Amino acid sequence: MLFRSKYTVRLIDDLGYKDVMSQTGSKTLFVANDEAYEKFFKNNPWGVHSYEQLTDAQKRVLFNGAQLNNAYVLEMMSNASGGRKNLSLRQESAAEAIDSVKFWRPEELPVNYNADEDEKKYWKRYNSGASKGIYMAIDASRPMITHFLEGNMREKNIKRSDVAFVLNDKDGWGESEATRAYVFDARVNQADVVCLNGYFHVLDKVLVPPANMAEVIRENNDTKVFSHILDRFSAPFYNDVLTKTYQARYSAAVDSVFEKRYFSINSRSGRLQTEPNEKLPNDRIPLLPYDPGWNAYQLSSSVPSVEDMAAMFVPDDAAMTDYFVSQGGRSLIERYAKKPNTKENLLENIDQIPLDIIQALVNNLMKNSFIETVPSKYYTIMNDARDQMFPPSQYPSEAAYKAVFTKTLMANNGVVYVMNRVISPADYAAVIAPALYNSNTQVVRTVVRADDSYIQGSDYSRAPLKQYFSTYLKAMQSRFSFFIPEDEGLNTYGYVDPASMANSKNTSNFRYFRFRPGDTRGVGGALAVDAWPVTYKPATGQQPGDKIMNGTTYASPANQELNKGMGAVKRSLLIEMVNHHIIVHGSDDTKGVETAQKYFLSRDGAPVIVKTSNRGVGMEVNGGFQEQLEGTPAAYTSTVKEVYDLTRETNKGYGNGKTYILDRPMQATTVTAYKAIKDHTQFKKFLDLCTGMSTALLEKAGFNAPFLVAGADDAKHSGWLKSAAKYEFFVRGESGGLQYNVANDDRLVRLFNNYRYTIYAPTDAAIDAELAKGLPTWDKISDYLDTNLQAEVKLAADKSNQDEYDRVNKHNDAVKAKAQAMVTVLVNFLRYHFQDESLFVDQVSHTGDYATACINEQTKAYLSLSVTQTPGQLSLKDKAGRTVTVDGTTHNILARDANFNKGMTLITSSSYSVIHQINSALLFDGEFAGGYAQAWSSPKKARAFVAKFRIKD
């Protein structure tokens, strides 16, 4: 297989491929004529001016890098394996990783000026000191060839103008022009020349396969700053295969050959988080989304490397200088730099920015799909907050978008778009930013970023928390108030473990945890936070002088897996704490917590109470636990020490709220709704009605009849027990197939379902008023049944007593029908006082309809209450049209129904509620304004009523 070009022939001869190219086989070559070579020698990236100046390595690049180890006609190159048409964008070349091995002089190697001793300087050994220089490949995977063929372009919606732009073709490529094909940036002039052992395709220039994106960025003259930053994520790794291959090929006395790799989520060996010469991963190393030096880059395990490549949006040096010296990145330099913020000090100053902070800038500019980021699809390119990276308001047309770029750089694993500006990540503009920047917020930073590198594909199952807090807090269309307890407060005052209080009446077992930044020491599934237990004394609360418990029984060091021992408790408490400190406001709410309103709901429904009129630095905020401690020696508040305004109104339209640094964390109440109601004696009769039901009474009333097997008397049928549970209100243990784990003397509201609620608790006087109108009690229903039910008659074998049998059954059916109506009235009466959503007596004005726990079976709709909030007052309108106003003194009682795991060591789910006293009860049916007996005035009416208001689970 020969092409009539002396340079191609010389390459074949010099590299020893004459016999290979002369034999039958399957090869594809991309070749250029002699004229193209003459032009190449006048201008090329290697600075060689004649064939004789080419090194053997360069010859291999020119020949092997333009060769495929299969025979392809041009049209078939876009087909993927298995006959899948038009899916291939790339092909694996015949080049080898060994071809890129060279001796790197010290001045060619990355330099890290960071002064923090904790940041490893992986290159220092080779760019200074005794061991200067290194033999290294820029990657150990086989280089690939990218081609632009119209079949693949049509399949992937890539326009000709996209390809022209990527190839820096100023003349363009119109849709009406002739078909073209490109291999990298070389145009195919003649395709499908047949040889005995394959095909060759003639190009319009000598094909010099580009390096990977990281190397292309490094070599480009005006992306040096970004390359410098990128290389902080890299390290040299010894490669035994490369070493032995290099020694054998060159007979060289080279002890070690390394490869340059980047710490990343997606690399040729999967997640690369293990440092050179180490065996265990270091989860404190910030990761790039993928290795930009990976020649054979693969988007995911389900997308073969031939079907796509990556893309990077890299600011040029001028843009990077402006950004850090005088624009958006200036604040980072001012916070971290050691030297004056000047162009001359730029690299040294940038290197002082912690790696996990600068990571956000780099990752935001790295996109995992070239196909989805071509210019014609610019409006679908998303930033780290999943917002448009190039919004139409700033880039109204494709032409305006393209004007951002000074050039494009073709690499063997992607395309680099060189920009004249820096696009800041949402990390720098969102409420999460202060958690990342502040040196005293490492615990919260660790928690909110714990899942960041587990977003892609199946990695979700490996995320330590599975909460993705940072993704949530970067929702730029939302508005947040984010409270961040600082490390000092978490280490001094800690966070109370509610399970320890629920699990024992012995206060000596009560504890709180002090949280500190820690080190996982490479343990997978751990979290870099230490949790040290301290005995909680209710009389004094959390005090700086409290001693950490002896032993490790209740401790959870940072290197403990979160699914083992107290690791699960630590995980649960930290998730709860962060959720409790996030408030989500309406999209048009520009003031957040800085209004006259006092009560706010956190992300998980826990109330946050603003205690002071001051709404900036010095503002005091409480959780329910702090409210329950008021007036005791253990009382405390959380005080705001710093405020960061990150609203879009003050940040050029891109922001999502305010961040408040707290001296210590808030915490939710440990009082259940049952305990809260029980502790207020004026609600005794309401509580008695809620707890007076018995399964025996329901069976006596005949509710279990549908579950009885014919010919049997099995009142304990499992289906019946599950059905009977829906009549309960406060439960403990098993109920209706669900488990409610709570302290022995406590109960949980069965109607609650991991949400937020309001309970309107009628006073005893209010209940008495309804009883006087005929509202039944459980005792009265039981007495009615005992008094009116007749002894059952067994039908004789000869049916001689048929009349008596029928009479008794008819009588008892009527009695049971009325009793069932009484039960249905009572249960719905009580349920109507349990409402979805937590509403407070507060300085707000709002009117709305809110669902209760009652349902109208005919309309299939939950019955609602019309609620009106005015400053200092909350009024209700029930289904009877009556207005009931919440008591002006006893209201806003906070409760949390926490359901613990079987071992009572951590909370598995919880519902928050606020309880208000009402001095008149609420009616779920307007017909009851004059009395309740009409619901069971006849068996027919009783059955109709039960059908309409049947109790649903």
Name each region found by the language model.
Residues 1-953:
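Mature, structured domains of secreted/extracytosolic soluble proteins
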